[in-house]
């Protein structure tokens, strides 16, 4: 069933007036004024995500400046994190799991820039699993990217052949999530298991407001 709501206010005005910052349900608390500022990335502008792409929460304008001073080119993409990012995998066979769709957009300019880096032998460093899914969704079998706006349900788990991403920055995820499968696919199950054991031993912070790791 589809319900149409008639209002003199725009969607964004309604969100700003009565909406709440969509902090993850596992926090088990109401959002606060601090969340409105802290639970958004330095890139965040448009409304629509049910959660923040949390790897980028560790970035600041100062860090971005230092990255650029090292000679790196920062390329921005647009994505809207979907509700399924919190959905646990309940199937015994992970291949039977149906992945959630997320809205993504890769501009022509961004695609050209990333393709140029790959063609010149450079590396693509990605912040976040959602960005990783976005890039892999927009690439052909040879790894070349094309402009795209739409949805993706690309499901990445061990055995997947990566086409674009060379290095990945990501937070520590829930053990029964599609996100842990994605990072295990990228780095290998045993390495991720070892990294998580090290994180637990040293009391790293997990999940959205937690620490992140760089997978080389």
Regions found by a protein language model. Give the residues of each.
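Surface-exposed, charge/polar-rich loops and edge strands
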Residues: 1-216
